[in-house]
Amino acid sequence: MACPGFLWALVISTCLEFSMAQTVTQSQPEMSVQEAETVTLSCTYDTSESDYYLFWYKQPPSRQMILVIRQEAYKQQNATENRFSVNFQKAAKSFSLKISDSQLGDAAMYFCAYRS
């Protein structure tokens, strides 16, 4: 049972990739934050490709997967979508999602994905 005022975000290590020999890893199995806090979810990946896309999806209790944000590897500017932003570090192969001013509706499982 969740406590009022707390958001539960499950982060499942997953590999939602569309090409072979690529790996995507998420390190946090579960997080909880209070409403209005900022939370950062981390993702690393391994690829030898130079042109690719990275995505963050969320799956709320309704079980419908929703695209939160995407980043093209050739763009140097980090993607931003309302309260969601990424910290994309191509050289370090790191792709973190930052959720600012978290809300109860943000409670979900979050998935990092790669596509070449």
Curated annotation (Swiss-Prot):
Residues spanning the signal sequence: 1-21
Subunit structure, as described in the record: Alpha-beta TR is a heterodimer composed of an alpha and beta chain; disulfide-linked. The alpha-beta TR is associated with the transmembrane signaling CD3 coreceptor proteins to form the TR-CD3 (TcR or TCR). The assembly of alpha-beta TR heterodimers with CD3 occurs in the endoplasmic reticulum where a single alpha-beta TR heterodimer associates with one CD3D-CD3E heterodimer, one CD3G-CD3E heterodimer and one CD247 homodimer forming a stable octameric structure. CD3D-CD3E and CD3G-CD3E heterodimers preferentially associate with TR alpha and TR beta chains, respectively.
Physiological role: V region of the variable domain of T cell receptor (TR) alpha chain that participates in the antigen recognition. Alpha-beta T cell receptors are antigen specific receptors which are essential to the immune response and are present on the cell surface of T lymphocytes. Recognize peptide-major histocompatibility (MH) (pMH) complexes that are displayed by antigen presenting cells (APC), a prerequisite for efficient T cell adaptive immunity against pathogens.
GO BP terms in the entry: adaptive immune response; immune response
Name of this chain's protein: T cell receptor alpha variable 38-2/delta variable 8
PROSITE patterns recorded: IG_LIKE
Family matches, as InterPro entries: Ig-like_dom, Ig-like_dom_sf, Ig-like_fold, Ig_V-set, TCR_variable_region
Organism: Homo sapiens
Domain of life of the native organism: Eukaryota
Disulfide bonds: 43-112
Glycan-bearing residues: 78
Gene: TRAV38-2DV8
Cellular component aspect of the GO annotation: immunoglobulin complex; T cell receptor complex
